[in-house]
């Protein structure tokens, strides 16, 4: 708003609820932005709290259900999750419910990178691949081994809609490397910022 004067950029709730670039400097500091965004203060625009793995499964299915059976039935709901979040009970229940309710407007985007915050990779704990994790639930599944390439991603995305069953929920998996472009890889990249004003800090 300060640069353009366009009122569409003004938050009607005032500065207390307006997010500025400077607020990013308060990330994970007392009274600042939380590491996992929550529906309060300057991040009140989020529809749901974030945090525990798999936490968003039920809200995503619920949102897709509400939209499908309202005047916004053509609106798609995208849920982003890593493979760790697919291990929770609520995730299994949401996948079953999505198929049973015919939520063809629900699309999971699975970041398949094999790591969470622990040293042990998920492949040591959770067997199989995204096809194994979704197809038995009746979902349409497509993906790419090159999850950082937009052309590959879009090709896989288009495959999801080749299904004749318009009520079939969909899962798009992307094979990635956690920490790519950040120079801290796998579990070591979690909650580990580069030292402020270091060479790595400015290179990113």
Please provide the spans of the model-predicted regions:
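Cofactor-binding active-site loop characterized by glycine-rich and histidine/acidic residues
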Residues: 1-101
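Structured core elements
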Residues: 107-109, 143, 171-173
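Glycine/aspartate-rich loop-and-adjacent alpha/beta segment that forms the canonical ThDP
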Residues: 132-135, 150, 154-204
